[in-house]
UniProtKB/Swiss-Prot annotation:
This is Lipid-A-disaccharide synthase. It is an enzyme of class 2 (transferase). GO terms for biological process: lipid A biosynthetic process. Keywords: Glycosyltransferase, Lipid A biosynthesis, Lipid biosynthesis, Lipid metabolism, Transferase.
Length: 375
């Protein structure tokens, strides 16, 4: 077989992690493989020749995207032209669907095999995107099983590869070791995780702290840990803590240690709910959006649940308190019993963890190479 050339594009840190794992698995099977495209430091360390820094693609939020739209479109156009000229054996777009799906469509029209790794949330909203995916994508690699079922129904070639987090997080986390590392005592510990973005923490931070204040009355000797995503979030939360007497430890990052150490979690909807589930920690999920945003999303979103544990269980396994239902009293009263006994949740968490633990990088590499076997 001639030297394999694989093009990949990742747009953010999570994609860089996935991309580097996939590259490692491909190299194990094809030591002479050449990688081109756009990746971050982890992908570059695996041998990626990145055409420009991945950070140029990592923009969050509508306003930021609009501010950089001209640059993003220009980079995408240049990337398409370069890749058509290079003619790689396969192109793999990793997440970042608003950037990569268009590239896949153009490359597939030029006769290049295309793979999309990590499904956008088409099963929940903007379902028409599946038409673009079907047209532009030879193979979809999903991290979650219900996503694969959705694509099968829509006639899109798909492979469920499992979730890399399920591979890296142990089936049974050592609570005592995590507590020792964080300097925590033996009593009940609750993790508060109000999100990693400024807007989320602005809407949920004080609410979670109010709920914690109520939990102090309900659970004797309780202690709280709150991992801060970065310095800006820490400053934001320190301001919210002024004037409060709470037995609380702020952590810098260390969200995985906080989850390993705690007995239960009060958590914002998002990827963190998957992490909490993989650590087998009972949780209550809360979320608040700006009223207009919530009103619009309620009409657009087709999914009955917002949290990944419930989407994976296909039933209400964990309580979801959204918008006006998310009061400090309701959060405290719902979480308190779970601190003492959350087995109803955690037994199912263990089953789901085993379903997702499939050695994702190797599964993905095998699927990509199977697509190329006739090249």
């Amino acid at each position: 077989m001639a030297q394999l050339c694989v093009a990949l594009v990742a747009g953010e840190a999570s994609g860089d992690i996935l991309g580097s794992g996939l590259m490692r698995a491909l190299k194990a099977r094809h030591p002479q493989v050449r990688f081109i495209g756009v990746g971050g430091p982890l992908m570059e360390a695996e041998g990626m020749q990145s055409y420009f820094p991945m950070e140029r693609l990592a923009v969050m939020g509508l306003v930021e995207v609009l501010g950089r739209l001209r640059e993003l479109l220009k980079r995408r156009k240049a990337l398409i032209q370069t890749l058509i000229a290079e003619k790689p054996d396969v192109f793999i777009g990793i997440d970042a669907p608003d950037f990569t799906l268009n590239i896949e469509l153009k490359l597939r029209q030029a006769g290049i095999k295309t793979v999309h790794y990590v499904s956008p949330s088409v099963w929940a909203w903007r379902q028409k995107r599946v038409l673009k995916i079907r047209e532009g994508c030879d193979l979809m690699l999903t991290l979650l099983p219900f996503e694969a079922r959705f694509y099968e129904e829509q006639g899109v070639p798909v492979r469920f590869v499992g979730h890399p987090l399920a591979d890296t997080i142990p089936l049974a986390a050592d609570r005592q070791a995590a507590r020792m590392a964080l300097g925590l005592d033996a009593g009940p510990v609750v993790a508060l995780m109000p999100g990693s973005r400024g807007g989320e923490v602005g809407r949920l931070g004080a609410l979670f702290l109010d709920a914690a204040q109520r939990l102090v009355e309900l659970i004797p000797g309780v202690h709280f840990v709150l991992p801060c995503a970065n310095g800006a979030r820490r400053a934001q939360l320190e301001q919210m803590l002024e004037g409060r007497e709470l037995p609380l430890t702020l952590l810098d990052g260390q969200s995985h240690q906080a989850l390993a150490a705690c007995d239960a979690v009060l958590i914002a909807s998002g990827t963190a709910t998957l992490e909490a589930m993989l650590y087998k920690r009972p949780m209550v999920v809360a979320y608040r959006l700006a009223p207009l945003t919530y009103w619009i999303l309620k009409r657009l979103v087709k999914s009955p649940y917002v949290s990944l544990p419930n989407l994976l269980a296909q039933r209400e396994l964990v309580p979801e308190l959204l918008q006006d239902a998310a009061t400090s009293e309701a959060l405290a009263q719902t979480l308190a019993p779970l601190v003492a006994d959350g087995r109803q949740q955690t037994e199912r968490f263990d089953e789901i963890h085993r379903t997702l633990r499939r050695d994702a990088s190797n599964q993905a590499a095998d699927a990509v190479l199977a697509l190329l076997k006739d090249r």
